[in-house]
Amino acid sequence: MPKVSVIMPCYNEEKCIARAIESLVDDYVMKHGEILVIDGLSSDRTVDIVTDFIKRDFPIKLLKNDKKLQCFGLNQGILAAKGEIIVRVDAHSSYAEGYVKKLVELLERTQAANVGGVMRPKGHTPVQQAIALAMQHPIGVGNAKFHLGNYKGFVDTVYLGAFRKEIFDTIGLFDTNCRTNEDAELNIRILKSGGKIYLDSSIYVDYHPRDSFKKLAIQYFHYGRGRAYTTVKHRQFTSYRQVAPPLLLMGLVGSLLLSLFNPLFLVFWGCYILALLAASLFTWSKRNISLKIRVLTGIAFMVMHTGWGAGFLVFFILPTRKHPKTRSGATLKKINHEK
C-alpha cells in the first residue's frame, strides 16, 4: 500500500481537533501514514492537545505556520510530506471510518487527479443546526454535489480531497493569495491540465459549522472574496452559483434604495423573504425539526447569501495589492494519465 501523508492546517481548534485526529487514526494510518498538523500560531490549547497525541505515539508531526493562513500551511505540509499520496483534511471536522484508506483506494481505482467525498454538516446548538440545514439545501449552496450528497461520478470540485503528491509538480502548490477558496482554485488548475476530479458520496466528512451568525457572515464574506479572486485569475465562471449571491445582494440594496421613491420596489424584498421562509419551513416536512430552528435556517440562508455576495463585490470595489496569476508555484502542464 502507498504511504500517505494527511495534511491538517489548523488555528485555534481546541474544541474540535482531538475529535478530528481520533476519527482519522486507524490501523491503515498507523501502518502506512503520517499526520502533519500545521498550526498557524494558535493562542488556545490546540498545540497542547496535539502534543499529547504525539506523546501517546500517534503518527503525528507538528509544524509551525508562521504566516498563519491556511494556504501557507497546506503548502508547508505538502513540502514536508513523505507520502506518495496527500490527503487534505480540516481540523473542524470528523471523518467516517476508514476515510483515508477509502480515498486512497478511490484514487487508484478511478485514476482521477483528485478524489473526495461529501460534507455532512452536524450542528449541536440551535444556530449550528440551522446553519447545517442551510448548508445542505440548494438555496444555501446551489448545485454543489459535495454538499447535496447521493452522487458518484466526475465533478468540478470536491470537499477537501486526496491527490498524488507528484501532481503538485505539474500544477503548482496552493495559491497563497487565496485566503479561502484555495481548494476550488486548485481544482480549476487540475481540470485545465487535463486531470479529472471524482466524488463518491459514500465517503463522508462530518463538518462542524460556525456557532454564530456573525462567524458565518465572516466565513462567507471570505468565501465570496476568494471566489471573486479565482474568477478573475482564471477568467471564467464555473457555475451560476458564483454570480447568484452578488446579483441578489445588488437587487436587495437597489430595491431598498428605490423604495424611497416608490414603495412597490419592496416587493422584491417580500418575495425573497417568502422564498426563504418557504424553503426553511416546508422543505424538511417529514423531519422532526422545531419551528425555532426552521426560522433560524431562513436567517442562515440570508447571512450566507449576503455575506458571500458582499465579499464577491468588495473584491472588485476595493483595490488589492495582489493580482491573480495564471498559476502558483509551477509551470502549468498537462497531467500524464499513462503513469
What are these model-derived regions, one by one?
Residues 65-81, 102, 154-158:
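Glycine-rich, basic loop-to-helix element that forms the pyrophosphate-binding segment
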Residues 117-123, 132-160, 169, 233:
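Short, flexible, basic/aromatic active-site loop/helix in glycosyltransferases
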Residues 107, 175-238:
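Catalytic donor/gating beta->alpha subdomain of glycosyltransferases that bind UDP-sugars
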Residues 22-32:
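Short, acidic, metal-binding catalytic loop of nucleotide-sugar glycosyltransferases
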Residues 86:
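Short aromatic/hydrophobic "clamp" motif used to bind/position activated sugar donors
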